[in-house]
Amino acid sequence: MITKEEVKKITKLARLKFEEDKVEEFSSRLSSIMDMINILNEIDCTDVKPLTSVCDMQARMRPDEVTSKDHSNELFDNVQGASQQLAKEVKYFITPKVVE
């Protein structure tokens, strides 16, 4: 059973404020939730395999391959307007000033 003092402690930790008459209500509600959890804890799950995924698909793995290709030109092809060539030369994006 969750006591009023425990509910008050939880509300303080969660930075919530309840009126005094609501504390008793939450005490009984939290107690019923804990009772449901205790019922689940009593279930024997020794022969149940842990569920890691809801589907049995395997991830396709590929070998890691190191490449030394410079992708910056392809990246800076996305820059719009006249600043595209400058962005390719200096290898960074040029943006309008946003902080005064």
Curated annotation (Swiss-Prot):
It is an enzyme of class 6 (ligase). GO terms for biological process: glutaminyl-tRNAGln biosynthesis via transamidation; regulation of translational fidelity; translation. Keywords: ATP-binding, Ligase, Nucleotide-binding, Protein biosynthesis. It comes from the Bacteria. Its EC number is 6.3.5.-. One of its GO terms (molecular function) is asparaginyl-tRNA synthase (glutamine-hydrolyzing) activity. It catalyses: L-glutamyl-tRNA(Gln) + L-glutamine + ATP + H2O = L-glutaminyl-tRNA(Gln) + L-glutamate + ADP + phosphate + H(+); L-aspartyl-tRNA(Asn) + L-glutamine + ATP + H2O = L-asparaginyl-tRNA(Asn) + L-glutamate + ADP + phosphate + 2 H(+). PANTHER family: GLUTAMYL-TRNA(GLN) AMIDOTRANSFERASE SUBUNIT C, MITOCHONDRIAL. NCBIfam families: gatC. Allows the formation of correctly charged Asn-tRNA(Asn) or Gln-tRNA(Gln) through the transamidation of misacylated Asp-tRNA(Asn) or Glu-tRNA(Gln) in organisms which lack either or both of asparaginyl-tRNA or glutaminyl-tRNA synthetases. The reaction takes place in the presence of glutamine and ATP through an activated phospho-Asp-tRNA(Asn) or phospho-Glu-tRNA(Gln). Belongs to the GatC family. Heterotrimer of A, B and C subunits. This is Aspartyl/glutamyl-tRNA(Asn/Gln) amidotransferase subunit C. The lineage of its organism: Bacteria, Pseudomonadati, Pseudomonadota, Alphaproteobacteria, Rickettsiales.
